[in-house]
């Protein structure tokens, strides 16, 4: 949902005139200092000097003075403990009586991505799957919009859950992970627009073939009018930093320019967006259906699917999902009429030889749920991803998409999406 209406949101601070360091000590030293040490050394002192100029002309923030104070509420943020998280992910995760293979068995005839350079059929455009054997870096962003009337409850929990997921099972070191959340005292780690952009630049800086980069965003998302003609629905997808009211959102074109364009062939970026209207939030040119084929826009098919979901939600008494499905139908029809986008031209422009894969929480015309799962506030998409990958780590691209949709079906109207920077064989093993 769109997070902003009115100016007086954060503690009725009006224009906010800036960020002040809170008087109290950090609420949780476990996450305050230990991760992303290189990031701290590289950007902690000279934040904003190097790469701001690169994007300031094309993506200028709104006019007016920058904010001066961020008065964070005095109540503590959601508490998170590693042991608690393992138990809360699912009542059956570590239960020996639960047979994970019965729920999400490994796909048949699954193979690892080939190391050789590939070529798009009928063209000379090369691309390369990453083997994910090089350096690992991650950027994790969770924004609850604390103290605002648009406050979310599960995004900071999502950030810490993803942190533990990466460090416990996928070889990511805390020294190479940056977490931005709006419950922190360290101003470098508050998810302002400037901090988020610089952290994105840090994530992809000096990446080499077979490196594995991971981006997770949990927070508000929305849409704004598309000005460069690259969107089928006429709308750009955006995400909202904590200071979006004064500094503006971050649009999909900008994130593509920062995190996709600079990557070399063979560099892996796995992006997970748990936000509304996030289907094409990285502007990747290839989107895949649950049948494993590249999707082409078909608004009437989407309307039919949303209508079926609405009927199921009505029959089960799920009012929130019913409203979401009906809203999705309206946005699909409204956005799909009268747009004539040169799809092949857009694919050529947005293509990347790097190995960029995105899992998003919903279609461009859908909202994503702030949910309660296993007794914990969480984003529905983040919870589904961790649950599926924990129960069965050996997933193909296709089975991962299908199983995440199964996790959300019936409870939520949103449909997770899979997109990529180049054509992918969806039957290959999903690695990161």
Swiss-Prot record:
GO terms for cellular component: cytoplasm; cytosol; nucleus. Activated by Ca(2+) which induces self-processing and is required for the activity of the mature enzyme. The keyword Cytoplasm applies. It comes from the Eukaryota. Belongs to the peptidase C14B family. Present with 1400 molecules/cell in log phase SD medium. This is Metacaspase-1. It comes from Saccharomyces cerevisiae (strain ATCC 204508 / S288c) (Baker's yeast).
């Amino acid at each position: 949902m769109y997070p902003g209406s009115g100016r007086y949101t954060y503690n009725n601070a009006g224009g906010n005139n800036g960020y002040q360091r809170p008087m109290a000590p950090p609420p949780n030293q476990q996450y305050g200092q230990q991760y992303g040490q290189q990031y701290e050394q590289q950007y902690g002192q000279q934040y904003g000097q190097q790469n701001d100029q690169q994007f300031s002309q094309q993506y200028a923030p709104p006019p007016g003075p920058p904010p001066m104070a961020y008065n964070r509420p005095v109540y503590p943020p959601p508490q998170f403990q590693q042991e608690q998280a393992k138990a809360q992910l699912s009542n059956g995760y570590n239960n020996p009586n639960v047979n994970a293979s019965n729920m999400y068995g490994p796909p048949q005839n699954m193979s690892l991505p080939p190391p050789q350079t590939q070529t798009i059929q009928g063209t000379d455009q090369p691309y390369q799957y990453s083997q994910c054997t090089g350096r690992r870096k991650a950027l994790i962003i969770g924004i609850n919009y604390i103290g605002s009337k648009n406050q979310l409850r599960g995004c900071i929990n999502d950030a810490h859950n993803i942190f533990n997921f990466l460090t416990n099972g996928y070889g990511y070191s805390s020294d190479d992970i940056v977490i931005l959340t709006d419950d922190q005292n360290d101003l470098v780690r508050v998810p302002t627009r400037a901090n988020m952009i610089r952290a994105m630049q840090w994530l992809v800086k000096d990446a080499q073939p077979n490196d594995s980069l991971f981006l997770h965003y949990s927070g508000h998302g929305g849409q704004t009018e598309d000005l460069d003609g690259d969107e089928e629905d006429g709308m750009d997808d955006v995400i909202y930093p904590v200071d979006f009211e004064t500094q503006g959102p971050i649009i999909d074109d900008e994130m593509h320019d920062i995190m996709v364009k600079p990557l070399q062939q063979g560099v892996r970026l796995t992006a997970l967006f748990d936000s509304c209207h996030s289907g094409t939030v990285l502007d990747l040119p290839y989107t895949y259906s649950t049948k494993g084929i590249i999707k082409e826009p078909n608004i009437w098919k989407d309307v039919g699917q949303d209508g079926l979901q609405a009927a199921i939600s009505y029959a089960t008494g799920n009012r929130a999902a019913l409203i979401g499905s009906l809203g999705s139908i309206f946005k699909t029809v409204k956005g799909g009429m009268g747009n004539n986008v040169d799809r092949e031209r857009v694919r050529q422009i947005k293509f990347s030889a790097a190995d960029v894969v995105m899992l998003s929480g919903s279609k461009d015309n859908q909202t994503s749920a702030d949910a309660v799962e296993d007794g914990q506030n969480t984003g529905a998409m983040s919870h589904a991803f961790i649950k599926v990958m924990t129960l069965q780590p050996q997933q193909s691209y296709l089975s991962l998409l299908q199983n995440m949709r199964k996790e959300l079906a019936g409870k939520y109207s949103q449909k997770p999406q899979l997109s990529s920077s180049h054509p992918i064989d969806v039957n290959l093993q999903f690695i990161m």
